Amino acid sequence: MTHTTTIAAKRGGLALAKKAAAAGAVALAVASLQPVSAAHAADARVIGGKPAAQNEFPFMVHLSMGCGGALYKKDIVLTAAHCMDGSGNNTRITVTAGVADLNSSGAIKVKSTKVKVAPGYDGVGKDWALIKLAKPIDRPTLKIATTAKYNRGTFTIAGWGDVREGAGTGTTKLQKANVPFVSDRACKWHYGNRLVPKQELCAGYASGGIDTCQGDSGGPMFRKDDAGKWIQVGIVSWGDGCARSGVPGVYTEVSTFAKDIAKAASAL
C-alpha cells in the first residue's frame, strides 16, 4: 500500500476495502484487519499486542476463512459482513472457540448452518453479520452496547491476525491490546468521506504501533461497562494499512445496529 494511492483494506485480508473507490484521499493510514469476502480473507493478528491468557476472553471465536468474531448467543456469532459471501444457508464455515491457542487440544469446533448479513450492506457502513451454529457452544457470550454510552474511553482489541502489516501469516495464539477512542472529527481528517460517522467508530494511537490488522476482521472491540463486565462496542472493519502513524483503525459502531442485530438473531 502506497502513500500516494492509499487503499483501505478490510481487516480480514489484504483485499481491497469496501471504500477503495476513494483511494488517494488519504496519505497515511493505520488500518484494522478485515477481509472483503470469505474467499479473500487472510489470517492476521493484533499488532503491538501481547498473548492473551486462556479463558481471558472466552467469548472470542476464530472463523475458518480467516476472520474473528464473538459469541452473541451460544449458537450465534457476531462478525463483520465483509467476511461473508452473503446471506443464506451456509455450512462451509468452521468456528473455533474455547481456546486462546488454536492448536490446543481443547478447541471446540462447530460448523455454521446459516449466515445473515446486515440488510442493505454494500461495502460502505453496516459492516456486521451473524452466523448461526449447528449447535450451541458452552462458553460465555459477549453483551453488545445498545446505546452510545460506552463509545468513548479505552477499548480492548483481540484477534489471531497479523502482528506485522503484510505478513500474511497470522498467529495461532490470541493477541490482545488496548487502543484509545478517536473522535469522528479526527478520524475524518484522515479518511474524509470514506468514514461513515453514524455507523463507524475509530480507535488508535496517533503514534501508531498498536492496531488490528489482516485476519482480525469481524472480531470485537470491547471495554468494561459500569458493572465491570465486558461489553462490545465495535467490530473490526477496515483501515489503511496496519498500525501506521497518524491513522486510526475503523470499527462498526455496534450500538447503532443493536436493534437490527437482535431482530436478525431472533429470525435465525
UniProtKB/Swiss-Prot annotation:
Keywords (alphabetical) are: Disulfide bond, Hydrolase, Protease, Serine protease, Signal, Zymogen
Disulfide connectivity for this sequence is: C67-C83, C187-C202, C213-C242
Which terms does the UniProt entry file under GO BP? proteolysis
Enzyme Commission designation: 3.4.21.-
Q: Which PROSITE patterns does the record cross-reference, listed alphabetically?
A: TRYPSIN_DOM, TRYPSIN_HIS, TRYPSIN_SER
GO terms for MF: serine-type endopeptidase activity
Q: Where is the active site?
A: H82 (charge relay system), D127 (charge relay system), S217 (charge relay system)
**Site entry: Required for specificity:** D211
**Is Secreted one of the keywords?**
no
Residue span of the signal peptide, if any?
1-41
The family database entries (InterPro entries) matched by this protein are listed as: Peptidase_S1_PA, Peptidase_S1_PA_chymotrypsin, Peptidase_S1A, Trypsin_dom, TRYPSIN_HIS, TRYPSIN_SER
Q: Which residues form the propeptide?
A: 42-45
Q: Which residues form a coiled coil?
A: none
What residue stretches are annotated with the Peptidase S1 domain? 46-266
Family per similarity comment: Belongs to the peptidase S1 family.
Q: What does this protein do?
A: Protease that shows preferential cleavage after Arg and Lys residues.
Matching entries from PANTHER family are given as: ACROSIN-RELATED, HYALIN
Name the chain's protein.
Answer: Trypsin-like protease
Name its species. Streptomyces glaucescens
